Amino acid sequence: MNFDTLKIADPEIYEVIQKETKRQRGNIELIASENFVTEAVMEAMGSQLTNKYAEGYPGKRYYGGCEEVDVAEDLARDRLKKLFNAEHANVQPHSGANANIGVYFAILKPGDTVLGMNLSHGGHLTHGSPVNISGTYYNFVDYGVDKETHLINYEEVRRIANEIKPKLIVAGASAFPRKIDFKKFREIADEVGAYLMVDMAHIAGLVAAGLHENPCDYADFVTTTTHKTLRGPRGGAILCKEKYAKMIDKAIFPGLQGGPLMHVIAAKAVSFKEALSPEFKAYQEQVIKNAAKLGEELKSRGFNLVSGGTDNHLLLLDLRNKNITGKDAEKLLDEVGVTVNKNTIPYDPESPFVTSGIRIGTPAVTTRGMKEDDMVTIAEIIGTIIDHPERIDEVSSMVKNLCEKFKLYE
């Protein structure tokens, strides 16, 4: 993109963008929730659509002059529905968190009981963490994973659900490397008379490509981010049955948000069109292949993988046998140009600020064009610096050499 005007108008921000672009080009990006959008998506986000206020929904706005942005929002909604075979879509949530809170606001009253996945077992802040508004306004009870297998014990979920009789069950995760059985969650929800919401933010791209069970076939409400594996702009969306459409739309506007971000909604539309292409399916297939290969290679280097491996785009590493915390591993890897995030592991003895693990994912490196052979190199980089932190210069050179093979925004 051309930043000639910005360079003159605001040299400080121009410099931030240049340095961040350099960092992205020169680093191996392994944060599972990050990706690299196309230039077409960025162009839509940087367009004149940012100037337009459009409170309301297409055809029912509170401002005049919305004829063109209505087209953009309709395209985004229609493409998203086609992508996931859904009856209704709301593309206005500014984030995945807003999408989740929007569903809660639509169907719950303060104090209602909800069953969600424990944050330290792979859930998300908005699934009832006590530090989040979800855990403050609603009575969240959590389920987790088995202590030995690190898999969801659906019979335990059923037992808890029958005990507490929640109004809503939330499925989905931010750090769970295995496939989730949405059909079983539907059966449990029906058994106790609960709504079922699935947060598919992390796996949306895999679902769109037909590589993971589609939660829209089972859930009353499905929320997602539009970035991560979906490779769109930062934002959120809600999919639901047509019978819930009005209550969901009302919960987002005027319930939770005011004016939608029309430039971002246009960028969402662009990314959804990209996701409907055959190339996108091939990309998602490679994401999974890369994650599986990276996991195998890390295991061969003595790393412990939570649940023993992965079915999706991410890996959760238990670093206790390496005598390093997640916090220190994140810092050490960052020093050589590998970006990961510290992450709690199930039944973690460390605090969330320290952690015993790191979460890594393959969406961003796959977007750059990396394949299985490159995962062998990445595993060597991670293994070498964790086991031999004194070899920082050598490993930094390995990172530089790998990144130079795969151009980014050039």
From Swiss-Prot:
PROSITE patterns: SHMT (PS00096). One of its GO terms (biological process) is glycine biosynthetic process from serine. Homodimer. Its EC number is 2.1.2.1. It comes from the Bacteria. One of its GO terms (molecular function) is glycine hydroxymethyltransferase activity. Belongs to the SHMT family. One of its GO terms (cellular component) is cytosol. Its cofactor is pyridoxal 5'-phosphate. Pathway: One-carbon metabolism; tetrahydrofolate interconversion; Amino-acid biosynthesis; glycine biosynthesis; glycine from L-serine: step 1/1. Gene3D superfamilies: Aspartate Aminotransferase, domain 1, Type I PLP-dependent aspartate aminotransferase-like (Major domain). The record marks 227 as: Plays an important role in substrate specificity. It catalyses: (6R)-5,10-methylene-5,6,7,8-tetrahydrofolate + glycine + H2O = (6S)-5,6,7,8-tetrahydrofolate + L-serine. Catalyzes the reversible interconversion of serine and glycine with tetrahydrofolate (THF) serving as the one-carbon carrier. This reaction serves as the major source of one-carbon groups required for the biosynthesis of purines, thymidylate, methionine, and other important biomolecules. Also exhibits THF-independent aldolase activity toward beta-hydroxyamino acids, producing glycine and aldehydes, via a retro-aldol mechanism. InterPro entries: PyrdxlP-dep_Trfase (IPR015424), PyrdxlP-dep_Trfase_major (IPR015421), PyrdxlP-dep_Trfase_small (IPR015422), Ser_HO-MeTrfase (IPR001085), Ser_HO-MeTrfase-like (IPR049943), Ser_HO-MeTrfase_PLP_BS (IPR019798), SHMT-like_dom (IPR039429). This is Serine hydroxymethyltransferase. Pfam families: SHMT. (6S)-5,6,7,8-tetrahydrofolate binds at residues 119, 123-125, 351-353. Keywords: Amino-acid biosynthesis, Cytoplasm, One-carbon metabolism, Pyridoxal phosphate, Transferase. NCBIfam families: PRK00011.1. It is found in: Cytoplasm. The modification N6-(pyridoxal phosphate)lysine is found at residue 228.
